[in-house]
From Swiss-Prot:
It comes from Bacillus cereus (strain ATCC 10987 / NRS 248). InterPro entries: Amidohydro-rel (IPR006680), HutI (IPR005920), Metal-dep_hydrolase_composite (IPR011059), Metal_Hydrolase (IPR032466). Its cofactor is Zn(2+); Fe(3+). 4-imidazolone-5-propanoate binds at residues 87, 150, 183, 250, 327. Gene3D superfamilies: Metal-dependent hydrolases, Urease, subunit C, domain 1. It is found in: Cytoplasm. Fe(3+) binds at residues 78, 80, 247, 322. This is Imidazolonepropionase. CDD domains: Imidazolone-5PH (cd01296). Its EC number is 3.5.2.7. NCBIfam families: hutI.
Length: 423
């Protein structure tokens, strides 16, 4: 007997097409079962099909979804989850048009958050991050990548990674930990970036032994780390058994996209300034292009990543919030979906695949997350919507009704959710 059977699902978005990264036409295709049903037993999906096919199945609990839509739990593959403080004091500078790198030089930006994170205890960081994770869950996210990078010293970086490990045990959302010690060059290492990177590399063996990080990342940008420094650093991390990511071409077209494809990074993230050659190389690689349009929006910039061109050229595109206190302080991945549709010229179908299938591959979770398939974890979202296009179309609010994590209800809007209204 099933534990739970969901029936009367108007649109069941299984996302279950070909295995592997989705590109071109596959990104614009959504496998949808009309009038669907999903069976759950011991936290695992055991039935996926139509309501007609589900007749005769027995379950301890039968949930009538009222003709609404069900999707897999969403995957946010790029966040800076664990940090201290906030940076609303920088809003005035941004409105005045002060460039981010100039704010950084003045001790703001990342360095401001570094100081606040250093001054926070691990428990304070955990409690703050739980608040943000709760919000992410309420937007339908069940798997999240979490970076360190607000320490720039060994003690604080360890503290962030240990906080992430504690959150993994205490919060229902699945976390994927990334070490981003190379997020900026500390003042005491100004002009000595190679020495700083070696210091970061010296931390990796113990980090690997304690399993505190799965990925290593670096901020490859003008005034931070060069392409050659980034490649050398990430290749050494790969030699130690880590998978790697790269903050690439966010501000200037340095060649970060090319570097990511060349070294076989799991993802290249941002890519606002990615060159035509970089896009071509990504298209011919298994590196996911994780685009972060919420950051471009919040920084009030005119030029967004060329998502349309990337998809047309064959790049596997994912979307993420880039949740962080400075350049994208939002947990709302649904808003990111809307911005991607409007500013990156992505179709609703492409947007959905970019926050499920491709985003799961960007963090090496393609075999466990992002799809509704028999044998996978029952990470599901019931939406207060009757079709998938409605979610990115009606922007700025959450359309989530209920979230199941491993077959258990982890979030419900409850009585606040409409039940009799029609769209």
């Amino acid at each position: 007997m099933l534990d739970t059977l969901l029936i009367n699902i108007g649109q069941l978005l299984t996302m279950d097409q070909e295995d592997g990264l989705l590109r071109r036409e596959a990104m614009n295709t959504l496998p949808v079962i009309e009038n669907g049903a999903v069976g759950i037993e011991n936290g695992v999906i055991t039935f996926v099909g139509t309501a007609e096919e589900a007749k005769g199945l027995q379950a301890k609990e039968v949930i009538d979804c009222g003709g609404k839509m069900v999707s897999p739990g969403l995957v946010d593959p790029h966040t800076h989850l664990v940090f201290g403080g906030s940076r609303e004091n920088e809003i005035a500078l941004k409105l005045q048009g002060v460039p981010y790198l100039e704010i950084l030089e003045q001790g703001g930006g990342i360095l401001s958050t570094v100081n606040a994170t250093k001054q926070s205890s691990k428990e304070e960081l955990v409690q703050k991050a739980k608040f943000h994770l709760d919000r992410m869950l309420s937007f339908g996210v069940t798997t999240v990548e979490a970076k360190s990078g607000y320490g720039l010293d060994d003690e604080t970086e360890w503290k962030q990674l240990e906080a992430t490990a504690q959150l993994q045990k205490e919060h229902p959302i699945d976390l994927v930990s990334t070490f981003l010690g190379a997020h900026a060059v500390p003042k005491e290492y100004k002009g000595r970036s190679k020495e700083f990177l070696q210091w970061m590399l010296d931390l990796l063996p113990e980090m690997k032994e304690k399993q505190l990080a799965e990925f290593v990342d670096i901020f490859c940008e003008t005034g931070v780390f060069s392409v050659e420094e980034s490649k050398e650093f990430l290749l050494k991390a790969k030699e130690l058994g880590f998978d790697v990511k790269i903050h690439a071409d966010e501000i200037d077209p340095l060649g970060g996209a090319e570097a990511a494809a060349e070294i076989g990074a799991a993802s290249a993230d941002h890519l606002v300034g990615a060159s035509d050659k970089g896009i071509e190389m990504l298209a011919n690689s298994n590196t996911v292009a994780t685009l972060l349009p919420g950051t471009t929006f919040y920084l009030n910039k005119e030029s967004f990543a060329r998502g349309r061109k990337m998809i047309d050229e064959g790049v596997a595109v994912a979307l993420a919030t880039d949740f962080n206190p400075g350049s994208c302080p939002t947990e709302n991945i649904q808003l990111i979906m809307s911005i991607a549709m409007l500013k990156l010229k992505m179709t609703p179908e492409e947007v959905w695949n970019a926050v499920t299938v491709n985003s799961s591959y960007a963090i090496n979770r393609g075999d466990v997350a992002g799809k509704i398939r028999v044998g996978r974890k029952a990470d599901l979202v019931l939406w207060d919507a009757y079709n998938y296009a409605y979610v990115p179309y009606h922007y700025g609010v959450s359309h989530v009704n209920t979230v199941w994590k491993n077959g258990n209800i982890a979030y419900t809007r409850g009585e606040q959710s409409w039940s009799t209204a029609t769209i």
